[in-house]
Amino acid sequence: MDKDSAIKLTNEEWESSIVPELIEYIKIPNKSPAFDPNWNKNGYMEKVVEQFAAWCRNQDIKGMRLDVIRLPERTPLIYIDIPGDIENTVLLYGHLDKQPEMSGWAKGFGPWKPVLKNNKLYGRGGADDGYAIFTSLLAIKILEAQNIPRARCVVIIEACEESGSYDLPFYIDHLKDKLGKPELVICLDSGCGNYDQLWSTTSLRGLVGGELKIEVLDGGIHSGDASGIVPSSFRLLRQILDRIEDPVSGQILVKDCYVEIPKKRIEQAKFAAGVLGNDIFNRFPLKENSKPVSEDPVELILNRSWRPALSYLGVGGLPEISDAGNVLRPFTSIKLSMRLPPTSSAKKVSKKINEILTKNPPNGAKVSFKTDWSVDGWMAPEISPWLEKALNNASENYFKKPAVLMGEGWSIPFMGMLGEKFPDAQFLITGVLGPGSNAHGPNAVSYTHLTLPTKRIV
């Protein structure tokens, strides 16, 4: 491949065509169904589908066929089939639905307000995962421009990923005859440890999430009257949470949440730690004097990829401080998110956590745990020599540095399903969610110059 020609075409297409499309995409509040139950009626998802499909149809790619598939009562899916020069099939995946707004955006910025500043495009969804469809087709155009033979390419863009991809299995079954058996799966919904080389994700954590609720009263009572007699639902909540998490160290106390970490993954974590050093935690906006749970980069990488961790996402039953009167509240609820090792069973852990949280309620309080997420993690198959060579060649060619293999801490439900359906396929899971990207949070950003490594692999 002529690297200079590839870079030239990429820069031209990215600046003149793709960035303007991403700007329009960010303006649309097409939240995933879990965050917008009226997504179909509101029409935002359809607006994005139409935008993406229109752009794709304007690309001059030989033999490309595009269909927008709409199964009954399901979010839509964009399916693109591009014939190749060899028999192999490459499956490229992305999604177009978004996380909700989130608070804390800087002045002048917002989730649906695209701001282009210093090669950074701020707004919800650009890097997670709006760029995927544009990157996929641009990569193919680069190969066509240089007459480089390639495999058949199938692109699928779903609209339910941020809700757990619960619609996707139906589409995969619907399309099974068309999909065939891909030899390589490329997913553009992952991350990178830095922006200085190519990163490939070797594993993804599983997730069990739900709402823990503790009820002590039928209604609020004057705290001066009831406190000291009626137990605080917040105190009981803390007491119950201590059953699954050490309140000092944060270590998870549920044995079912742990697995043996493969030696190969430990070796890869050590290599990645040598590349990243303290950047593994310096990339986060820690408050002054705040410290990470460890200062050993290897342990932090393994914590983030192969060990369980509990996060508290939201709370119910607590008023805003400005509205907080002297009332002993009737209940407290909290949204929990337990990240799990890639090879653990989310179903088994979910059952165990429910049992631990709800048995023997303190003071006879009413305790419930309603699970809303239960997703297995994923571990990539052993990388084939040809793919490992391609990764390193691409990274050395464009960055003068080797590729890095590392586990990620988030979940992509689609990958576990694909691993089961295509056990012989190789996987390249990569993306632009690196330092400063802040996916799912405020001030989410896409770095507008960072897509070329993925294109080179295609």
Role assignments for model-derived ranges:
Residues 193, 202, 223-315, 344-366:
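Acidic-enriched catalytic cores of C-N bond-cleaving enzymes acting on peptides and small amides
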Residues 121, 127-203:
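Acidic/histidine-rich catalytic neighborhood of metal-dependent amide-processing enzymes
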Residues 242, 249, 380-425:
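Active-site-adjacent substrate-binding region
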Residues 448-454:
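Conserved small/polar residues in nucleotide/adenosyl-binding loops
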Residues 1-104, 331, 335:
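N-terminal helical capping/dimerization or prosegment-like subdomains
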Residues 63, 87-157, 438:
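Active-site metal-coordination/substrate-binding segment of hydrolases
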Residues 96-98, 156-165, 188-193, 216-218, ...:
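Acidic, glycine-rich active-site loops and adjacent beta-strand->loop/helix elements
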Residues 338-341, 368-384:
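A short beta-alpha structural unit
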